[in-house]
Amino acid sequence: RPALAARAPDSVQSPPVAPGRKLVGVVLYPGFEVLDVFGPVEMWAYVPDFQVVMISQDGGAVRSAQGVSTLSDYSFASSPQLDIMMVPGGIGTQTELNNNAMLDFIRKQNEKTQLTTSVCTGSALLAKAGILKGHKATSNKNFFSLATSQDPSVDWQGKARWVEDGKFITSSGVSAGTDMA
């Protein structure tokens, strides 16, 4: 059987957190947008002081909106504290807006992150979690009303490609996440 046809494992051994490196965690969920995740990951992979990990509610494989599965390094329960958290967008955002485990994880991690970031409709999840109150933020222009309806106390910026406000960096549609990173 060719190596490329080999079945991927259902789980991976979580990598140890390397001392002195910033831990960048990407929060995956069913229906995430591939480019929202892997555009920024490509940029962060070149930063020598960054260690990038994938996190999902239950760990294991998570299927994207494009049908490609990605293995999580950690579940919400096993995740270490992140220095930088990134929440991508995707069609699955609409389901996750009602997922208390997701919203609780975002709130808990955000308490101690140095940066909390999002791509596309990921900002809707940050807003729904209540962590963007009083901050400037943006989202995908095609789904802007989805994000803005989650928390009207956010200072939503409709024309921005990305917005930095304190420790929050939000970006609009897919490729803007690469620019943000």
Show where each model-derived region lies:
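Extended, subdomain-level signal for the structured scaffold at the beginning of enzyme domains
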Residues: 1-116, 123-128, 133-134, 144-159, ...
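A short glycine-/small-residue-rich loop at the edge of a beta-strand within enzyme catalytic domains
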Residues: 93, 138, 172
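Conserved SAM-binding loop
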Residues: 116-118, 170
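FMN-binding flavodoxin-like domain, especially the glycine-rich phosphate-binding loop
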Residues: 138, 158-164
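Conserved anion/nucleotide-ligand pocket segment
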Residues: 164-180
